[in-house]
């Protein structure tokens, strides 16, 4: 079992972010100890780490909350969860394409400067 501080270190989430996610219903403490401190198990750690990945892809808190609600309903919602993840994956591919276009624009400008062009455009 992990304290909130340990969970923070293991996932890279700030303690305040963990509490925020709890307030939004997308993360829950496994329980509380005698001093009323939150504690978390390994499943919660894995889920918190997955939340990090989802957020890094740009998924909103509300979409993660919807995904979590489906997750909590069990195996019958696997098709809907797959659809959500595929939609998010498509968004990531769009982000990659946009970044590749940005790299091409930078490369083009670098090549122009290296060839002696002084144009600003």
Identify the function of each model-found stretch.
Residues 4-7, 14-17, 34:
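Short glycine/proline-centered loop/turn elements that form peptide/ligand docking sites
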């Amino acid at each position: 079992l992990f304290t909130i501080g340990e969970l923070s270190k293991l996932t890279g989430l700030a303690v305040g972010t963990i509490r925020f996610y709890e307030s939004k219903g997308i993360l829950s403490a496994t329980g509380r100890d005698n001093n009323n401190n939150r504690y978390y198990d390994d499943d919660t750690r894995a889920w918190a780490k997955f939340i990090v990945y989802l957020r890094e892809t740009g998924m909103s808190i509300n979409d993660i909350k919807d995904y979590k609600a489906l997750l909590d309903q069990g195996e019958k919602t696997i098709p809907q969860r797959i659809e959500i993840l595929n939609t998010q994956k498509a968004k990531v591919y769009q982000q990659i394409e946009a970044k590749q276009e940005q790299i091409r624009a930078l490369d083009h400008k670098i090549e122009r400067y290296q060839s002696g062009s002084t144009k600003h455009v």
